[in-house]
């Protein structure tokens, strides 16, 4: 393209190019170079999804729907389940992965402290659902990108996305049975029910102190496992 005029180069960048190599397979692959114009549908959908999700966030719809739910939560398993479902709900209705994580986090953060859990437990629960399920809906930013790249709706490969489908289930079931849990003092209860000491996750100082105090109280009451020697 060294002999092309500058205007032609910008036109190719914007509208794409047509490649004719004489090889049918190569043409089918290289001929898809659609330039910036070829990505506009995806970009427009992402921008609309962000605007819509931001409006819902400012309205506080999710907080009103799920804010009262956390007062009925008294176990680690039910808290993890509520976090997972809220995160997936936000993905589906707010159309963006970041809102699927950022909106539920402040709703349940103090509940994790109340049950003596580490903030990394909250982070992992949000990732288990909010990140993995964001790509499962065609109308989210992630889903729109996948549609543009793969040329198919996420609903087509939905039944085969085993990690995305099974990870939230695994997270809830293990937590419900008191397994796979990060505690505020850095200890971790593994899949076999053994609790080992570890390094505490980062958290606001006041929240961390509250979580530690609650963890000690729950251990004294037999509601949380003690560290195995």
Protein language model regions, located:
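Hydrophobic alpha-helical transmembrane segments of multi-pass integral membrane proteins
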Residues: 49, 69-107
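Core transmembrane alpha-helical segments of multi-pass membrane transporters/permeases
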Residues: 2-61, 80, 84, 88-89, ...
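Re-entrant/interfacial helical elements at transmembrane boundaries that shape
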Residues: 67, 97-111, 140-151
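Short amphipathic alpha-helical coupling elements at transmembrane boundaries
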Residues: 15, 64-74, 106-114, 124
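Juxtamembrane/interfacial segments flanking transmembrane helices
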Residues: 57-66, 99
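Alpha-helical transmembrane segments of multi-pass membrane proteins
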Residues: 78-91, 115-136, 160-165
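Membrane-interfacial loop-to-helix junctions in multi-pass transporters
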Residues: 34-43, 69-84, 115-122, 154-155
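Juxtamembrane and boundary regions of transmembrane helices in multi-pass small-molecule transporters
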Residues: 114, 143-229
């Amino acid at each position: 393209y060294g002999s092309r005029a500058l205007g032609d180069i910008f036109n190719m960048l914007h509208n794409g190019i047509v490649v004719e190599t004489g090889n049918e397979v190569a043409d089918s692959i290289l001929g898809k170079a659609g330039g910036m114009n070829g990505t506009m549908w995806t970009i427009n959908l992402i921008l609309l999804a962000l605007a819509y999700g931001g409006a819902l966030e400012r309205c506080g719809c999710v907080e009103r729907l799920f804010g009262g739910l956390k007062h009925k939560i008294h176990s680690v398993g039910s808290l993890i389940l509520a976090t997972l479902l809220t995160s997936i709900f936000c993905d589906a209705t707010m159309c963006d992965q970041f809102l699927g994580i950022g909106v539920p986090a402040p709703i349940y953060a103090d509940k994790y402290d109340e049950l003596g859990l580490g903030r990394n437990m909250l982070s992992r629960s949000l990732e288990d659902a909010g990140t993995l399920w964001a790509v499962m809906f065609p109308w989210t930013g992630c889903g729109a990108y996948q549609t543009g790249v793969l040329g198919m709706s996420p609903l087509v490969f939905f039944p085969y996305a085993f990690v995305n489908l099974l990870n939230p289930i695994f997270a809830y079931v293990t937590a419900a049975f008191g397994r796979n849990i990060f505690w505020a003092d850095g200890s971790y209860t593994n899949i076999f029910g053994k609790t080992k000491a570890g390094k505490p996750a980062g958290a606001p100082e006041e929240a961390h102190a509250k979580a530690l105090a609650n963890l000690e109280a729950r251990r004294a009451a037999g509601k949380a496992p003690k560290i195995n020697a």
